Regions:
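Exposed, low-structure sequence patches enriched in small/polar residues
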Residues: 1-304
Length: 304
């Protein structure tokens, strides 16, 4: 904390370069955020770093007889230090993406990265000699398509190394993220997401997590709609493989929200809603309601 006689003052800058042509897209960025720089009127999640990025894309185009319309081969290099020139992270990635029929798009990416873990002595800011450096190799696949005119589906798969920051060690991640959006009618839209994530280290799992997010919207008319949101998470943390932290073996959450919205005019919307949350851990045998809320608000979009 600062005393009344102390002040913070530092500098920040960012340079961007981009070039686009029919077959090439090039980009470069240099950013510097001083250790004592603060952006009180803007979002600044971290300071004390300098970062360089270089990216290049080579584009290819299909002809009338091809099943694909466009393909891209990409490469990106990134490096980040603190302002004392101590390495925080650097990575090199390459990817291949292709656009095909049914509004489909697929991307395969390989990433090699070096990153530092937690500081061994948290009372000092030094990175060199005070952290462990880890090497990550990851494979990422993303695919999306519209099997029907009213349906969108996507899947993302992440496999490979990932730092277990809670325990300052290298682990192995398996993560699958799926999404289906169905416009069931002119009024009804159903949007379902599910994420499965598992981290392993030292031959055993660290955690297994499942997250389901369901959103249902019903447009009553041009002025009003109903929206229901249900979010359920189930996290199983291995109490025998988290040596640096105390964890709960069972963590389950269920939250729900129902909102009615009515547009009074193009600038004003009235909301009426209900929300609740439920929780379970090692000390509970079932989901217990934590809180419930009834609320109303009026939103006005002011235009000068």
């Amino acid at each position: 904390y600062l005393t009344s006689s102390e002040t913070l003052s530092d500098q920040a800058y960012k340079f961007d370069f981009s070039h686009q042509s029919e077959y090439w897209e090039l980009a470069a960025e240099q950013q510097y955020i001083g250790k004592d720089f603060r952006a009180d009127l803007g979002y600044m999640p971290k300071a004390d770093f300098t970062q360089s990025d270089i990216a290049a894309d080579r584009l290819f185009y299909g002809d009338d007889s091809s099943f694909w319309s466009q393909a891209t081969i990409s490469g990106q290099w990134q490096i980040q230090h603190n302002t004392n020139n101590e390495l925080i992270a650097r990575s090199l990635s390459s990817s291949f993406s292709i656009d095909g029929p049914l509004l489909s798009a697929f991307t395969l990416q390989l990433t090699h990265a070096e990153k530092v873990g937690l500081r061994h002595n948290k009372t000092i800011d030094a990175i060199d000699g005070n952290t462990t450096r880890f090497t990550e190799n990851q494979l990422n696949f993303f695919g999306e398509f519209d099997p029907l005119i009213s349906t969108y589906a996507s899947i993302e798969v992440i496999l490979g190394d990932e730092i277990d920051y809670q325990n300052d060690r290298l682990g192995n991640i398996t993560e699958i993220i799926g999404n289906i959006t169905w416009n069931a009618s002119k009024h009804l839209e159903i949007d379902l997401y599910h994420t499965f994530s598992q981290l392993e280290a030292d031959g055993r799992y660290v955690y297994k997590a499942n997250l389901t997010d369901l959103r249902v919207s019903y447009q009553l008319n041009v002025n009003s709609y109903l929206k229901l949101t249900l979010v359920y998470s189930d996290v199983d943390e291995n109490v025998n493989n988290n040596p640096m932290v105390d964890v709960s073996n069972i963590e389950k959450y269920l939250s729900s929200q129902l909102i009615y919205a009515y547009k009074l005019n193009p600038q004003t919307v009235f909301f009426l809603g209900y929300s609740d949350s439920n929780y379970r851990d090692d000390f509970l045998t079932q989901l217990e309601k934590e809180q419930k809320t009834f609320f109303t608000k009026i939103s006005y979009a002011w235009m000068p």
